[in-house]
Amino acid sequence: MRKIIHIDMDCYFAAVEMRDFPEYRGKPLAVGGSRVQRGVISTCNYEARKFGVRSAMATGYALKLCPDLILVPGRMQVYKEVSQQIRAIFCRYTELIEPLSLDEAYLDVSDCKLFKGSATLIAEAIRRDILAETGLTASAGVAPIKFLAKVASDLNKPNGQCVIPPDEVAEFVKSLSLRKIPGVGKVTAEKLSSLGLNTCADVQAYPKQELIARFGKFGTVLVERAHGIDERGISVSRERKSVGVETTLAQDIYTLEQCQQVMPGLIQELSSRLGRSAKGRQIHKQVVKLKFNDFKQTTIEHRSDEVSVVMFYELLSQAMARQEGRGIRLLGVSVGLAESKDTLSPLMVRETKQLDFVF
């Protein structure tokens, strides 16, 4: 058993803006697209969420829900700098840190001797340090496995904490909605619901082999998570897994020819980014992404060990076959990166070591 903490900053980008510009406090605020150009909300504060505004929502729709919504373009460099401050705080407690984004990370504190090894007290201390040194609040989840730590961090937001001790895992997962399991999105949840599967308890009672036959490898993962099993360790590799570029179009486009006109600029920018951040890395796939005007999206990928411009156009044609008459509002291209030959695989830690838990 391990002691895993998942730290998730509360409405991070918006919180930084409210910290630096007090006039925004207490007012609905969103970081993202402007009123003039089309775009999407990156994040918003809790005042905006009361009106139904959410991350990844079209800016125009968000303004309909909340006409007084304050929109700011965002300051990514500032967000990165604050994230580095937070990362430095994590390092005081453990070297086993897996960043998921600028505002969240997993920490394995199994060997941390502070607070007599209590993961609960360690999480509280980390949150206190973050607040004292950055002026921002964080929520935390503490559990013996990764996915439950992430679930727990969302239960007492904002500025809260939830602990799931090892002896409570089995009971906790029984009533857990399958939507809380990573990989179970809306479409998968609907498929599971059609089988009468809505909670982990439902999966526990369902024939395992039938789930595997229906869902393949994901069926195996689903059964494990539903039983409170997650043997993934903390990955401390910092290598990028992909490089991509995408653009939200000023107006919807509808034809393959229109999309093809957008591609050269995307491919050129992708080439530049590969040169800057992935020089010498081998690729293992190419990907084209389309987002439609109903905000659903599709991706087409092709396994390859070299970048082919022709293949990007072929993938675009395949993606357009899924258009179904919808307008296209976003187009993106990316490549998946193989591990560097001179680096080790991500360090997977504490898979089997048994520890005395002090939660």
From Swiss-Prot:
Residue span, UmuC domain = 4-185
Needed cofactors, names only, are:
Mg(2+)
Q: What GO cellular-component annotations does this UniProt entry give? A: cytosol
- Marked site positions, Substrate discrimination: 13
**Enzyme category, top tier:** transferase
| Coiled coil stretches, renumbered | none
Query: Where along the chain is the active site annotated?
Result: 104
Provide the E.C. number(s) assigned to this enzyme.
2.7.7.7
- Kindly state what the record says about how the cofactor is bound: Binds 2 magnesium ions per subunit.
Q: Which BP terms from GO are recorded?
A: DNA-templated DNA replication; error-prone translesion synthesis; SOS response
Localisation per UniProt entry: Cytoplasm
Annotated binding of Mg(2+), by residue: 8, 103
Q: Which GO terms describe its molecular function?
A: damaged DNA binding; DNA-directed DNA polymerase activity; magnesium ion binding
Highest taxon above the source species: Bacteria
Q: Which UniProt keywords apply?
A: Cytoplasm, DNA damage, DNA repair, DNA replication, DNA-binding, DNA-directed DNA polymerase, Magnesium, Metal-binding, Mutator protein, Nucleotidyltransferase, Transferase
Reactions that this protein is recorded to catalyse: DNA(n) + a 2'-deoxyribonucleoside 5'-triphosphate = DNA(n+1) + diphosphate
HAMAP family attached to this UniProt entry: DNApol_IV (MF_01113)
Note the subunit structure.
Monomer.
The family assignment reads: Belongs to the DNA polymerase type-Y family.
Family annotation (NCBIfam families): PRK02406.1
Purpose of the protein = Poorly processive, error-prone DNA polymerase involved in untargeted mutagenesis. Copies undamaged DNA at stalled replication forks, which arise in vivo from mismatched or misaligned primer ends. These misaligned primers can be extended by PolIV. Exhibits no 3'-5' exonuclease (proofreading) activity. May be involved in translesional synthesis, in conjunction with the beta clamp from PolIII.
Matching PANTHER family, A to Z?
Answer: DNA POLYMERASE KAPPA, DNA REPAIR POLYMERASE UMUC / TRANSFERASE FAMILY MEMBER
Name of protein: DNA polymerase IV
Q: Which organism is it from?
A: Shewanella sp. (strain ANA-3)
